[in-house]
């Protein structure tokens, strides 16, 4: 279960009280449709009593994830950043993800002391930073960001599903499931599909109602 060990270690190393250590994570990296969404979050106090049930978003049921989301968004400072499909196709998914992370961090509007990012690559940022592999299972700040990003993107894909029900984005959230792929070949691609992601380059048919 994630805790404040990483945050406390960093706080001690920079020798500053009440420092702002921000966790960052993204959702939608491998999806065929929809934006990549990043969240940035930090806790105003490092109290282990407030982190019960905060886990990597992938380890929570949808119902539990919503419950935890409602709790953590009331006790953390947080922000969301998006990179849309056009930016993904233009800049590639890694650079677009880093762009979304930068936007999420800028949205906090505060003096950040340190940034910790889930994964093995960290974007070029104007703050001290480090990447932490499996960070959403280690750092509670990253785990909180993971949940916020996941719930935000899921809600968006569920909304898009109402416009394009053929692709079942309410279920697959834009990822390449069997049904999604079959629907792509049957109905064509939409403006929300990533044209640089296989098999999209080979699909010329465009969606029309």
UniProtKB/Swiss-Prot annotation:
PROSITE patterns: RNASE_H_2 (PS51975). GO terms for cellular component: cytoplasm; ribonuclease H2 complex. The keyword Nuclease applies. SUPFAM superfamilies: Ribonuclease H-like (SSF53098). A divalent metal cation binds at residues 25-26, 118. It is an enzyme of class 3 (hydrolase). Residues 19-209 form the RNase H type-2 domain. One of its GO terms (molecular function) is RNA binding. Signal peptide: none annotated. It is found in: Cytoplasm. Pfam families: RNase_HII. Manganese or magnesium. Binds 1 divalent metal ion per monomer in the absence of substrate. May bind a second metal ion after substrate binding. Its cofactor is Mn(2+); Mg(2+). GO terms for biological process: DNA replication, removal of RNA primer; mismatch repair. It catalyses: Endonucleolytic cleavage to 5'-phosphomonoester. PANTHER family: RIBONUCLEASE H2 SUBUNIT A, RIBONUCLEASE HII. Endonuclease that specifically degrades the RNA of RNA-DNA hybrids. Belongs to the RNase HII family. This is Ribonuclease HII. It comes from Ehrlichia canis (strain Jake). The gene is rnhB.
């Amino acid at each position: 279960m994630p805790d404040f060990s990483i945050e406390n270690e960093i706080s001690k190393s920079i020798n500053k009280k009440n420092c702002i250590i921000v966790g960052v994570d993204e959702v939608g990296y491998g999806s065929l449709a929809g934006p990549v969404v990043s969240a940035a979050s930090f806790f105003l106090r490092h109290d282990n009593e407030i982190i019960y049930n905060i886990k990597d978003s992938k380890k929570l049921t949808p119902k539990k994830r919503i419950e935890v989301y409602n709790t953590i968004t009331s006790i953390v400072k947080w922000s969301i950043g998006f990179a849309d499909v056009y930016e993904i196709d233009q800049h590639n998914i890694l650079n677009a993800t880093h762009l979304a992370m930068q936007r999420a961090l800028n949205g906090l509007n505060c003096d950040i002391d340190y940034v910790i990012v889930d994964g093995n690559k960290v974007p070029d940022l104007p703050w001290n930073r480090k990447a932490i592999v499996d960070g959403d299972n280690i750092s509670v700040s990253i785990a909180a960001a993971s949940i916020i990003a996941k719930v935000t993107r899921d809600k968006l894909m569920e909304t898009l599903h109402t416009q394009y029900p053929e692709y079942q984005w309410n279920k697959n959230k834009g990822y390449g499931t069997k049904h999604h792929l079959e629907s792509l070949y049957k109905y064509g691609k939409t403006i929300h599909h990533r044209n640089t992601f296989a098999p999209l380059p080979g699909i010329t048919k465009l969606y029309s109602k």
